[in-house]
Amino acid sequence: MSIPVSPSPSRRDVLATLLAGLAGSTVSLDAEAQSAEPSDPSVYIPKAHLVQDRAFLHAFMREFSFIELVTTSPTLRITHIPSVLAPAQGKYGTIFGHISAQNDQVKAIRAGARALAVFRGPHGYVSPGWLVTDFSRQGVPTWNFAVVHAAGRLVPIDDPERKYELLATLIDQYEQGIGGTDYRFRGLPKDEVMKRATGIQPFEIEIEQIEGKFKLFQERPEPDKVAALPKLDTYRERSLEAYTRHFYATAPK
């Protein structure tokens, strides 16, 4: 059984949409594309920052697919994992992932507890010094960001074939994301793969509630948006490669 996933958009395409398209206009919210506004939201979202267009949210979730999986039963647990989104499966889509079988959060999966998946996008400090209107320049700094919360009940995946297909789909997704290598998961001896897979607990979450918060100056005066965009392009975080080198050199032994 394969997991019906859609091709992931490029990081450049998603960032261009977030930082230019959304900041410069309003995302279309026609009746067909909307998700119902949550009656009990998990995050505070001012109207100006609320995005409900499901296709837009799904594209974001596929691009920024390394999630925080949050559960509160039987105790608060947060696990950081890659995920796969099947956008056409279920009313709002279905999230697939896995955690270590030694992780205490397995108890929440086995119990069918409710979970929240947090998808984080670009974020950064915004200085009033970047802006041009008098109102903004006399104000205080802020932090712009994009995030999607998706909630639903955890369902364990125990069937060996479904477990294998989840791993294959997940690996294919990320191999394509780095441009591909000569590694072929599906070419490995399946019995050996499944022996190793006893160390994980796969799961799925059919999304029952989805919330998009995009705080990207879309409600600000046009001159401020135009002035801020090139400054955001110069905001560079340390890359994984750079931080890994730093960690190797400075971490306590």
Residue positions per predicted region:
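N-terminal secretory signal peptides and thylakoid transit peptides that target proteins
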Residues: S2-L22
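Boundary at the C-terminal end of the N-terminal hydrophobic targeting segment
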Residues: A31-S35
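An N-terminal domain-cap segment
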Residues: E37-Y92
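Charged, gly/pro-rich active-site loop segments
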Residues: D40-I45, P122-K253
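Catalytic micro-motifs at enzyme active sites that drive phosphoryl/nucleotidyl and oxygen chemistry
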Residues: F56-H58, V70-S73, S83, D104-K107, ...
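Short connector loops at helix/strand junctions that flank enzyme active sites
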Residues: F64, I78, G90-T94, R110-R114, ...
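A short mixed-secondary-structure module that forms the rim of ligand-binding clefts
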Residues: V84-G129
